[in-house]
């Protein structure tokens, strides 16, 4: 893992017997992305995450896709989450809390986050089909769980209504992107302060 102390940039690589995942990101970017996980639909979702959060994101993942997509999906969430946490540094000045409500045609999803170093996921999302393309829909919860745990954020995702499974998933990723964009933004009125009366996050 490498972190630039003057800017909110991090690079993380994770190698196991199941996957090899590389992530480089810039929290203060322009939403530029270069993503290749070997899973087309996951790539599409990570591109949405980058574009709508304005986080510059590069992802390279190689995994045991001949078995299934589980390990690659989960490990990609792990490494992106870890990179976000590392890039945040001391967490000083961030707004910390944010909520985004994302409509997408017939679908509407609410995402709330607390960038607190207290990881937790509430997932109130259901699907009407077991797969989107070749990807099992149950894997999306695995991705968000891995991301929240390793980014150190409390993450609540609730699909309030919707019928189209693609729209439901995409609204979850876009909701995370918009909430993350707001929560990690530096508040100029509190730029050098930890956003907690305790003076520390995570305890």
Curated annotation (Swiss-Prot):
InterPro entries recorded: IGPD_sf, ImidazoleglycerolP_deHydtase, ImidazoleglycerP_deHydtase_CS, Ribosomal_Su5_D2-typ_SF
Q: Which GO terms describe its biological process?
A: L-histidine biosynthetic process
GO MF, one example: imidazoleglycerol-phosphate dehydratase activity
One Gene Ontology cellular component term attached to this UniProt record is: cytoplasm
Q: Does the keyword Lyase apply?
A: yes
Q: Name one Pfam family in it.
A: IGPD
Alphabetical UniProt keywords: Amino-acid biosynthesis, Cytoplasm, Histidine biosynthesis, Lyase
Entry EC number(s):
4.2.1.19
Q: Which residues form a coiled coil?
A: none
Q: Which PROSITE patterns match?
A: IGP_DEHYDRATASE_1, IGP_DEHYDRATASE_2
Into which EC class is this enzyme placed? lyase
Catalytic activity annotated for this protein?
Answer: D-erythro-1-(imidazol-4-yl)glycerol 3-phosphate = 3-(imidazol-4-yl)-2-oxopropyl phosphate + H2O
- Subcellular localization(s) per the UniProt record: Cytoplasm
Main location as per UniProt: cytoplasm
The pathway where this protein functions is: Amino-acid biosynthesis; L-histidine biosynthesis; L-histidine from 5-phospho-alpha-D-ribose 1-diphosphate: step 6/9
Keyword Cytoplasm set for record:
yes
Annotated family: Belongs to the imidazoleglycerol-phosphate dehydratase family.
Q: What name is this protein filed under?
A: Imidazoleglycerol-phosphate dehydratase
Organism equals Parvibaculum lavamentivorans (strain DS-1 / DSM 13023 / NCIMB 13966)
